[in-house]
Amino acid sequence: MAINLFTSESVSEGHPDKIADQISDAVLDEILKQDPKARVACETYVKTGMALVGGEITTSAWVDIENLTRQVICDIGYTHSDMGFDAHSCAVLNAIGKQSPDINQGVDRADPLEQGAGDQGIMFGYATNETEVLMPAPITYAHRLMEQQAKVRKSGKLDWLRPDAKSQLTFAYENNKIVGIDAVVLSTQHAEHVSQKDLVEGVMEEIIKPVLPSEWLSQNTKYFINPTGRFVIGGPMGDCGLTGRKIIVDTYGGAARHGGGAFSGKDPSKVDRSAAYAARYVAKNIVAAGLADRCEIQLSYAIGVADPTSIMVETFGTGKVSNETLVKLIYQNFDLRPYGLIKMLDLIRPIYRETAAYGHFGREHFPWEQTDKAEALRAGAGL
């Protein structure tokens, strides 16, 4: 059989786009703590010496945007001008307005169950049984490399590590089964003084080896560690960052389709976020139930309308029952109206800042990762 290669990438919490995502979701969380009915669409832009927080927010809550922004940047690790960005001295600009009343009248209803979608759009969810968390392996392990980079950096074990980093993994598949890792790319921002030799050795021993399963590595695996040879200038000094610019990193690493809507900074009335979480929940439960090895769900909505305008299921030839049967089971077991899925997944909680780095999916403590519907789906399918 032919070997197929598939690649996914991740970025660290110190990547400029991820700084922006985390600030936007920190604002959302602080508002939801005070006002569960808030409408939030918060966008952030970061560049050398500044963070601009804007968007449309309608709420009774009061949030100290400046202090919160500085705290997030500080928690990530940008605390000194040597890194090109300093939480204590950067300018924080606030350009927040209110949500349009035209949108409000389409979303808000006297009966919460009839709450309309906050916008039209398409959302995808995906699951595969190739990892224990029912996620594609390339994105799962790319995230784990970035989590390990942050852990080692914050522990002080490699004191020359800096917050900005990227990983990329190429997996080899035969017959849709993993046969190994073909290539590992890891670039990390670092202090000026460290040698390339020490950096390569430190990254290999402290970040790569503890994360990647040895059975997938071989003498043919290629390693590219800081392949340019220098990565001192990073973070917002190296590139400006924007909320919502890492939507493939946030989801399935390119292994599934994407509807185009970003997540961070949006309250759960925005189906871009909440319905994408629900679609993951549905797909994961179908795979957990053994009804398919791989499953992709598409949902679509019209602004101001509660019921989804469509539900599509694709199992890539791995389904144990027909796609038509799966669609019926979805309608029977999941309430995919905006208010229904918010209740189903208990989404009006301050849980979003944590989602804004290292992926929204495949992390078992989030409610959309539960497999509590698997048994009912199996029974409904007659298996």
UniProtKB/Swiss-Prot annotation:
Function according to Swiss-Prot or TrEMBL: Catalyzes the formation of S-adenosylmethionine (AdoMet) from methionine and ATP. The overall synthetic reaction is composed of two sequential steps, AdoMet formation and the subsequent tripolyphosphate hydrolysis which occurs prior to release of AdoMet from the enzyme.
Entry binding sites for L-methionine: E56, Q99, D239, K270
InterPro entries: ADOMET_SYNTHASE_CS, S-AdoMet_synt_C, S-AdoMet_synt_central, S-AdoMet_synt_N, S-AdoMet_synthetase, S-AdoMet_synthetase_sfam
Subcellular localization(s) per the UniProt record: Cytoplasm
Residue sites binding ATP per the record: H15, D164, A165, K166, R230, F231, D239, R245, K246, A262, K266
Region called Flexible loop, residue ranges: 99-109
Main localisation: cytoplasm
Protein name, UniProt field: S-adenosylmethionine synthase
One term of GO molecular function: magnesium ion binding
Cofactor binding note: Binds 2 divalent ions per subunit.
CDD domains on file: S-AdoMet_synt
Chain sites annotated for binding Mg(2+): D17
Key word Chloroplast present: no
EC code(s) of this entry: 2.5.1.6
Keyword list, A-Z: ATP-binding, Cytoplasm, Magnesium, Metal-binding, Nucleotide-binding, One-carbon metabolism, Potassium, Transferase
Any one of the GO BP annotations: S-adenosylmethionine biosynthetic process
Pathway as given in its UniProt record: Amino-acid biosynthesis; S-adenosyl-L-methionine biosynthesis; S-adenosyl-L-methionine from L-methionine: step 1/1
